């Protein structure tokens, strides 16, 4: 049983004679209990006493350790040897012992711990609560961890909660900050590449949003020497999304002017076509034999880019693909490569000449190749590989890759005065506009951009239900020395 200090003081002042008698009587009883407890405890009590005495004494003003715990309240006496269950009335002997110990404690000199400097570290112990139990003193123990704080903090900021920070945690945070301040070069390089890729992705997203919003975009370009001028037009048409992409590049390698033009028509999604736009020409110009053996470089680059795309998509469940119809101008030689059903057509001496043949499953040579590889060509609205894909060659298409390859067919054409212009277009144009009609429409327009727009508008008016994208390249034989400048996109 625990008595409040204020109540004891009031009782002592009210009856000093009875308090003196109780003190002498309690002292005699306490000495008897002490002797009995020491004899019963033996060596164990001696060791426990030694361990307890090694700890600093509890500050006498700290009354928190004697407060009754709301959930567990057992009273311990003489190191825990005598316990009283909650609700049991204390005996007269226990009351006398408690009064005697409290009187002795109040009479004993107070030893204060040296005050801790304001703002000093707060030591936190996660060990179970421990305290020094004075023999004959009955008190209740809270199982909460013991926290040692400075007296100045308790007295200077009463009732204020102190935020306790672990020095171990602070040290770990400092180590993390140090590691972040000195990044590894490889990590920096990867971070830079990630930022660059994110920037490119944002630009591509803006372009897609623009096409999806207006459904139409076009533009033009001229070479520095004035020999080439080209225009492009891309129209979403009746489709809900845009899966056609185009690419135009110009560069100088070994003092030779290099120009590259490409149409990429995606199916089952836009990922493959977009990948080709970003990587196909870049890989081609890096090929070691690009200038010396251009045909070999194109063939190997097509296969390499297809393999890299499949690797990049290995973690996904998509299986989209794309065509590729490209024209590469190196000096006075034009190389046209094709995979799929996009097409390249030139106008030479006023005649329409196809420089590529569509890769369709109903082509006798393509059907024989597919069946020799173990594939099947069947009719499903049109002739399809495995009843699924309506073209016999393509980039991507992992599930049909054994039969649907990305090996290009390449045609070489020498540039002479009879070569007037080149048309590259997706099947959204060629399905409704024959080669001869396309050539006739381009002849009417002087500017290649206007000609490209004319082709897409004609295809749409004739009922094309696909995306429509085309590039028109005109060879200006009479303007070899003329000035030129790029033109901006229009929509």
From Swiss-Prot:
Q: SUPFAM superfamilies from the xrefs? A: PP2C-like (SSF81606)
Give start-end positions of Acidic residues composition bias: 95-105
One Pfam match: PP2C
Which residues belong to any copy of the PPM-type phosphatase domain? 229-475
Region Disordered, residue ranges: 1-211
Kindly report, in one word, the top-level EC class recorded for this enzyme. hydrolase
Q: Which cofactor does it need?
A: Mg(2+); Mn(2+)
Catalyzed reactions: O-phospho-L-seryl-[protein] + H2O = L-seryl-[protein] + phosphate; O-phospho-L-threonyl-[protein] + H2O = L-threonyl-[protein] + phosphate
Please name the GO terms that the record assigns under molecular function.
metal ion binding; protein serine/threonine phosphatase activity
Task: Please list the residue ranges that the record marks as compositionally biased, kind Basic and acidic residues.
Answer: 1-11, 187-211
Q: What InterPro entries does this protein's entry cite?
A: PP2C, PP2C_BS, PPM-type-like_dom_sf, PPM-type_phosphatase-like_dom
The note describing how and how many cofactors are bound reads:
Binds 2 magnesium or manganese ions per subunit.
| Family affiliation | Belongs to the PP2C family.
Q: What is this protein called?
A: Probable protein phosphatase 2C 52
What organism, scientifically named, is this protein from?
Oryza sativa subsp. japonica (Rice)
User: Taxonomic lineage per UniProt?
Assistant: Eukaryota, Viridiplantae, Streptophyta, Embryophyta, Tracheophyta
